[in-house]
Amino acid sequence: GANDFMRF
């Protein structure tokens, strides 16, 4: 989603 960059 829009916050996939938060998936570590």
From Swiss-Prot:
Phenylalanine amide modifications at: 8
Which cell locations does it reside in? Answer: Secreted
Q: Which GO terms describe its cellular component?
A: extracellular region
Q: What keywords are annotated for this sequence in UniProt? A: Amidation, Neuropeptide, Secreted
Per the UniProt entry, what are the Gene Ontology biological process annotations, in alphabetical order? neuropeptide signaling pathway
Report the principal subcellular site.
secreted
Taxonomically, the superkingdom here is Eukaryota
Keyword check for Secreted: yes
Family label: Belongs to the FARP (FMRFamide related peptide) family.
**Protein name from the UniProt record:** CalliFMRFamide-8
